[in-house]
Amino acid sequence: MKSNFYHLAARTAVRPAIRPILAGIAALSLFGAGLAHADVDASKSSVIATTKQMNVPVDGKFKKFSAQLNFDPAKPTAGSANVSIDTGSYDLGADDYNKQAQGKEWFDSATYPAATFVSSAIAPAGGNQYKITGKLTIKGKSQTVVVPVTVTAQGATQTFDGSLPIKRSQFDVGTGEWKDTSVVADEVVIKFHLVASKK
């Protein structure tokens, strides 16, 4: 039997809880994609993750993360990224939705308080394009991902833009009644825009 939360989500086209939760999973992989030896200005940056529930797209957002990063466009292959995301910091704009996101069927934040991305290689992809390969771990499940990034430099400021699709099922996010991908899409697509000041 579906939970009351399911019926609320099914009726609500503007702010269903599950779609933003799924969007957040994918965001985890992107913070390692371009915070290139710099401090990110959160007020000017955005990470928008989109998935679909019953064919309706919805966005979502993480509030806490830490990153140890090293990236020089002149020596991209020597760069590295090590990122930790607080899975309990995903904010859907309502306390009950946030608690749902932290629950066992989704991030299980009590058991897995952090999701991580650790780069293994950074490769030029032509012009100001780069591909960052690394291991993304969520709920104890790891997958190798390749994050495409566009880096733009203006004076002391760098911006990093890109998108990445992942499958929530590969990380056991959305289990039980939420495992049905005909209701909640398996694919999550992240678009990010990060603004940073060079150190």
Language-model segment annotations:
Residues 3-24:
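Bacterial N-terminal signal peptides that target proteins for export
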Residues 36-199:
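Low-complexity, acidic/polar, glycine-enriched regions of mature
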Residues 18, 29-34:
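Hydrophobic membrane-targeting alpha-helices
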